[in-house]
Amino acid sequence: MSVNQMQIEDVYAVLNSIHGQVTGNADMVAINTSNFVSVANTMLQQNTDAVYSALMNTITKTIFSTRPYSRQFGGLIVDNLKWGGIIRKIQFGDTDAVADEAFHNIVDGQSVDHYIVNKGDVLETRYYGSTVYQDVMTVFRDQLVNAFSGPEQLGSFIAAKANEVNNKWTQWTEDLARGLVINAIVAKREQYDGWQEHPGQVLHLISMYNDETRSSITINDIKAGASAKPFWEYVRAKIRTVQRMLASRNTYGMMQINGHNIVRHTPYSRQKVYLLAPYMDLMETSTLSEAFHNDMLQYADYEGVAYWQAIREQNNDYPLDRVRASTYVYLDIETGKYRNANIGEEVPFVDHVLGLIFDEDFTSINIKDTIVQNTPMNARGLYFNTWLSAHASYLQDFTEKCCVLLLD
């Protein structure tokens, strides 16, 4: 079933399915407009509550089964099978090789012990908890009766309600995913920026460019003028370098819990690249855009993001490349536990965010336990309610690779 429109034959199929559910009789079916009205009237007269419940269940089940996530950050959604392998993660750290030349120094009358124990470095992390999403839609009896007055009306009603459910679901999951991205940017900048033991946490691209080229450009210089083209060529090269570093087995862009020598690599096919679209537009007009997209981005999950957090603030001073968070979650590498950092009232901005490149296991969301419940008709108000409920579980694993790119 299309979310935007329905063919007449699809409407007949829906009506016949509802008729079978409500009456338990599959003999009387709708095959034309006249027959459609007869079947619809029979159902409504017999049990209006059951008709409404069957109709809404049909609509919502179609939406949830197809999951058309045409929204930003869609790559962060994982299914139950993938999530089951994430909530309890077993990781193995590198241990030093044993310097042993016993086989070169065999001595008569002595044995060589080959039962020496090396238990290895094993790290187990667990992720718990979920949040509940719940929303309600109200449909009046007059709307339901009008919907069953003909196949075109029912098709329009189904398409409208399907769009309503899909839009609510899409917006909710996008907001959750956006929150995870914002948390990653703020936590990386506040907690891990500048760690020499673990490079690649945050790259300050303008400062790096000025240091390497002995220039003194600012954020305004990269938008137009003579400095724009060489700078964006530099950024394009740095993005390729970051992707190559993430693909190599090292500690670039990740944190290690003390006492555990976990080393990772992220193949290009498992990299996610989220970059701010307005800046990407500048890059494409300043460099060979086709060559850029034919680089390593073609192998990664690349997405141009319209804005990071909001399109405007109350004082109209909220650029598209700015994020802020009054609290964020980060990994305490001393204890291996996650902590909440309350910044307080003076919430710092993270300005000029170009984007982030990360492993697909760095952050994700799982939507589960989707439930649709319909109320009987309200006897006084003559309306029905449909409640949509679901649980959302999400994680952010700072022992996985993630590099934040800032234009400062």
What are these regions (language model features)?
Residues 190-323:
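Extended, solvent-exposed, turn-rich assembly/linker loops in the middle of proteins
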Residues 31, 69-76, 174, 186, ...:
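Short glycine-rich, low-complexity/disordered patches
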Residues 9-16, 52-60, 155, 170, ...:
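Generic detector of well-ordered alpha-helical segments enriched in charged/polar residues
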Residues 6-9, 31, 39-54, 152, ...:
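Alpha-helix boundary/N-cap detector
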Residues 1-66, 288-408:
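Extended, compositionally biased alpha-helical segments that mediate assembly or anchoring
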Residues 50-137:
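Assembly/oligomerization interface modules of large self-assembling protein complexes
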Residues 68-69, 167-178, 248, 395, ...:
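Intrinsically disordered or highly flexible coil/loop and linker segments, enriched in small
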Residues 121-195, 382-390:
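Long, contiguous amphipathic alpha-helices that act as assembly "spine/axial" helices in icosahedral shell
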